[in-house]
Amino acid sequence: MSSQNKITLLLVDDEIDFLQTIAERLLLKNFDVIVASTGREAIEAAEKNLFDVAVVDFQMPGMDGTHVLKALKDRHKYLEIIMLTGHATIDSAVECTKLGAFKYLEKPYDFKKLVEVIKEAYEARLKKKFEHDKKHMEKIQKLSFRESPLGLLRALSHLDDDEK
């Protein structure tokens, strides 16, 4: 992965030692990592930065992981969010899934598995964004054709010239 294609992560956990350890390990794996130790910090970071993937602790004081998940999804449509928890229940996993979580992993986590899931989440984000952009372009093309068929035909002929 080149420096241009680094996955940008938001890492959210109220356990500072855990947060520092996992952030350091992810940095060594060539991820860009921004950390937040509270839900409020996570939301503030998301207002200032565009993240590819977020890894969020489910159980935090103040604002719990489900509130953070919802707030992040409201701000960033294509952000994939992985929930981490030390107290997994079926109900909490279902709730997070309904709110749009990509995956729900239990602590203690397997670091190699976490890295794999982060990469899967990143790929899912790219795919969703690509599909959205593709639909958007198709809509623009349809509108362009309706409004100006000759303009679209000229544009398409230039595309054909570029492929030669």
Locate each region found by the language model:
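Two-component/phosphorelay signaling modules centered on CheY-like receiver
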Residues: I16-I34
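C-terminal output helix
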Residues: Y109-I118
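Short amphipathic alpha-helix used as the core "switch/output" element in two-component signaling
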Residues: E44, T66-Y78
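Receiver (REC) domain active-site loop signature in two-component systems and cognate sites
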Residues: M60
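C-terminal output/effector regions of signal-responsive regulators
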Residues: E123, D133-K164
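Active-site residues of response regulator receiver
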Residues: D13, D57
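Acidic catalytic/metal-coordinating carboxylates
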Residues: I7, S37-E41, D64-H67
